Amino acid sequence: MSHLIFNQPSEDKSALEDAGDFTPRFDDRGLITAIVTDAGDGELLMVAHMNAQALALTIQTGTAHYFSRSRGKIWKKGETSGNLQTVKEIRTDCDQDAIWLKVEVAGHDATCHTGRRSCFYRTVTLREGKPMLDIIDDERHFDPQDIYGK
């Protein structure tokens, strides 16, 4: 599969904001933030990062690929768990420095490595002057031990 080449972003702000060339603005580490929601119900599933190769693979294959900052490599989301993300729509923000993927999740319909549907399964609350986490979605769609051996 040929590797897409992205042109450098224009210095002209109106060129970034209008239709035409998609010229993603990667940060100084070569990454762009990807916000991922369910294409059906709009639930926020995860936030990740992409480098140019992961973004190109996502556009070309229709399957979400991301760049793992901790592992320093590209990964196809769901390759191990079976919870592949089929991309239904890709959007970018006004200055093209963030991507929004609307996806359908296969397999267990779970995105988080903890087995939950969304990585955003906790709320932050203030109790007695201290920020605390509360779990609002404890439903596990799969057992991470069975999938990842962790």
Curated annotation (Swiss-Prot):
<dbReference type="InterPro" id="IPR038019">
    <property type="entry name" value="PRib_AMP_CycHydrolase_sf"/>
</dbReference>
<protein>
    <recommendedName>
        <fullName>Phosphoribosyl-AMP cyclohydrolase</fullName>
        <ecNumber>3.5.4.19</ecNumber>
    </recommendedName>
</protein>
<comment type="pathway">
    <text>Amino-acid biosynthesis; L-histidine biosynthesis; L-histidine from 5-phospho-alpha-D-ribose 1-diphosphate: step 3/9.</text>
</comment>
<keyword id="KW-0479">Metal-binding</keyword>
<comment type="function">
    <text>Catalyzes the hydrolysis of the adenine ring of phosphoribosyl-AMP.</text>
</comment>
<comment type="similarity">
    <text>Belongs to the PRA-CH family.</text>
</comment>
<keyword id="KW-0862">Zinc</keyword>
<dbReference type="GO" id="GO:0008270">
    <property type="term" value="F:zinc ion binding"/>
</dbReference>
<keyword id="KW-0378">Hydrolase</keyword>
<dbReference type="Pfam" id="PF01502">
    <property type="entry name" value="PRA-CH"/>
</dbReference>
<keyword id="KW-0460">Magnesium</keyword>
<keyword id="KW-0028">Amino-acid biosynthesis</keyword>
<feature type="binding site">
    <location>
        <position position="119"/>
    </location>
    <ligand>
        <name>Zn(2+)</name>
    </ligand>
</feature>
<comment type="subunit">
    <text>Homodimer.</text>
</comment>
<feature type="binding site">
    <location>
        <position position="112"/>
    </location>
    <ligand>
        <name>Zn(2+)</name>
    </ligand>
</feature>
<keyword id="KW-0368">Histidine biosynthesis</keyword>
<feature type="binding site">
    <location>
        <position position="94"/>
    </location>
    <ligand>
        <name>Zn(2+)</name>
    </ligand>
</feature>
<dbReference type="InterPro" id="IPR002496">
    <property type="entry name" value="PRib_AMP_CycHydrolase_dom"/>
</dbReference>
<dbReference type="GO" id="GO:0000287">
    <property type="term" value="F:magnesium ion binding"/>
</dbReference>
<dbReference type="InterPro" id="IPR026660">
    <property type="entry name" value="PRA-CH"/>
</dbReference>
<feature type="binding site">
    <location>
        <position position="93"/>
    </location>
    <ligand>
        <name>Mg(2+)</name>
    </ligand>
</feature>
<feature type="binding site">
    <location>
        <position position="95"/>
    </location>
    <ligand>
        <name>Mg(2+)</name>
    </ligand>
</feature>
<feature type="binding site">
    <location>
        <position position="97"/>
    </location>
    <ligand>
        <name>Mg(2+)</name>
    </ligand>
</feature>
<dbReference type="GO" id="GO:0000105">
    <property type="term" value="P:L-histidine biosynthetic process"/>
</dbReference>
<dbReference type="GO" id="GO:0004635">
    <property type="term" value="F:phosphoribosyl-AMP cyclohydrolase activity"/>
</dbReference>
<keyword id="KW-0963">Cytoplasm</keyword>
<dbReference type="GO" id="GO:0005737">
    <property type="term" value="C:cytoplasm"/>
</dbReference>
